[in-house]
């Protein structure tokens, strides 16, 4: 049970900005990396990761599943992050992805989304290129805006993704 002072306005992690939505999402979704009770980074959907000066690689746990039993894949992160940066999404927290190569230019509509420095090399390997060295990217990857979104489910909601509980697919620990 979670005690909230208000109903979350919507639970689309790519667009959420309020505390109520963040609290619910933190209990129902899991990103590549999570925080433990001592605010230390721990594996989330990623079994392991490597941060380099020029980018990062994340290896997805094969047992990571969505609430419908389908596997969580690197493609789900690529889709979500591309959606955050799509100018038509108008995500207020898009800037938090700007360490990713070409993210700001994609978000401003100056480059096509295909130029974004994130790609699923396979279902279990996500590769990220940086604009500049970002040694704290592991901390960013734990933020709600970096949560995965499965494209086929998103498309099936006809623009209502995250508007109601049945319009959201969960991958969190509960």
Language-model features, listed with the residues they occupy:
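N-terminal lobe/hinge region of extracytoplasmic solute-binding protein
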Residues: 3-54, 169-171
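Short Gly/aromatic-enriched secondary-structure transition segments
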Residues: 14-24, 72-75, 140-146
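Second-shell loop/turn segments in exported
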Residues: 15, 60-68, 114-117, 164, ...
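Sec-exported extracytoplasmic/periplasmic mature domains
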Residues: 33-37, 61-65, 82-90, 133-135, ...
